[in-house]
């Protein structure tokens, strides 16, 4: 995804995440520094302040693993971060980063079969290399919000809500 003159990428997911982080910061009455203190890995390691502030400024192509740390620190759901206030089904709030990867893989496979495309054709359609497509299809690797938004755009779906769409039947991993 390309940057504009201000260095921002036109990605509604980045905007939704930034909006949610700012809303939560204001609700809690925290400075950016204190907000960043909330974000720690399962091992207790702090998320870098720069990662947090660049995410708030929409200059960071944040990954699902980093978003999981943020969601945990704020006690929010993944869906809450990605949807930016848009209504999503209740089951979507139970998905973690691994479930999101599996849901994305299911959607890609569902759309590929619906369009009757070969794997290489689907990779071409969503604008990724075949090796990347294989990782997406297997729900392996750490996916970024720019990749998710690019896939949604290629499939002509709303980036903020397509992962939680009830129009696409749940896969094995969805609940």
Regions inferred by a protein language model and the residue ranges of each:
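Key DNA-contact positions within bacterial/archaeal DNA-binding proteins
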Residues: 33, 50, 79, 120, ...
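A short, Lys/Arg-rich alpha-helix, primarily the initiator
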Residues: 1-30, 88-114
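DNA major-groove recognition helix of helix-turn-helix/homeodomain DNA-binding modules
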Residues: 63-80, 144-161
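Short alpha-helical "recognition helix" segments of helix-turn-helix
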Residues: 34-41, 121-123
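Alpha-helical residues within the helix-turn-helix
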Residues: 26, 37, 72, 113, ...
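Recognition helix of helix-turn-helix/homeodomain-like DNA-binding domains
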Residues: 40-62, 127-143
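Short amphipathic recognition helices of helix-turn-helix/homeodomain-type DNA-binding modules
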Residues: 68, 73, 80-96, 161-175
């Amino acid at each position: 995804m390309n940057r504009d003159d201000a260095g921002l990428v036109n990605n509604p997911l980045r905007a939704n995440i930034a909006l949610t982080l700012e809303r939560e910061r204001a609700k809690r009455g925290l400075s950016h520094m204190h907000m960043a203190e909330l974000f720690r890995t399962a091992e207790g390691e702090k998320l870098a302040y720069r990662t947090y502030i660049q995410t708030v400024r929409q200059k960071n192509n944040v990954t699902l693993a980093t978003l999981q740390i943020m969601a945990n620190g704020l006690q929010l759901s993944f869906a809450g971060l990605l949807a930016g206030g848009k209504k999503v089904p209740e089951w979507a709030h139970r998905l973690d980063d691994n479930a999101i990867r599996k849901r994305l893989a299911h959607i890609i496979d569902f759309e590929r079969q619906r369009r009757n495309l070969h794997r290489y054709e689907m990779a071409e359609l969503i604008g990724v290399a075949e090796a990347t497509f294989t990782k997406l299809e297997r729900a392996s690797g750490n996916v970024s919000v720019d990749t998710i938004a690019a896939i949604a755009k290629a499939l002509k779906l709303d980036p903020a809500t397509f992962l939680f769409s009830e129009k696409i039947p749940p896969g094995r991993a969805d609940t």
